[in-house]
Amino acid sequence: MNIFLNNFFTICDAPRAWGVYFQDSASPQMEALVELHDNIMFYLVIVLFGVGWILISIVRNYINTRTPISNKYLNHGTLIELIWTITPALILILIAFPSFKLLYLMDEVTDPSLTVFVEGHQWYWSYQYPDFLNEDDEELEFDSYLVPDSDLEDGALRMLEVDNRVILPELTHVRFIVSSGDVIHSYACPALGIKCDAYPGRLNQFSVLINREGLFFGQCSEICGILHSSMPIAIESVSLEKFLSWLQEQ
């Protein structure tokens, strides 16, 4: 029983076979996105059953009534017209306002403690940590490539593992600056609720706060050529002490 529960409640930070729901949230914005999705689904289910009930009632009434048209002199109904006009408008308002609020909050960049510059290439990612210098007084930077199947270690995820992961401290406001060196790419990591297009010659940015340790995978989400599927993203969240130790090793 314990084995079943442990397997059932394992944190899902990567795509899995037959997965039909979101990956487990690892940031406040992803938690907000999941909550918004669930709220919208609540309204959609009500609309689905309400409209379905009306349609079924009309069909049954048409079949069971000898005279399908109960009142041939009825040209309009003010009450029903008000209902089917005002009700959808109220539902749209209930959906739109939380959506606009979340969109605004996600666009805000909180005062960051750390900045990471990301540049997309065909077909790999380049990272820079402009806040830190290595032993040669140069900015910490590296490239991140897909690990081929022949070099995968036991337990590693195919088409998702990379040779150099992005290491970030947990519970720290991080700003990502995203650009491209060739064609349009898109930097996305579902568990963190982030997706930012990378345009050549243009800088986009977003902010993220990872609220727990873990390894989070993403992929380029803009078709960018023949090896588009070979641009995985691996972000590893560690404690501040481990992050500082990693910096000293670079």
Predicted regions and their residues:
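Non-transmembrane, membrane-proximal soluble domains of secreted or membrane proteins
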Residues: 2-39, 59-250
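Alpha-helical transmembrane segments
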Residues: 37-62
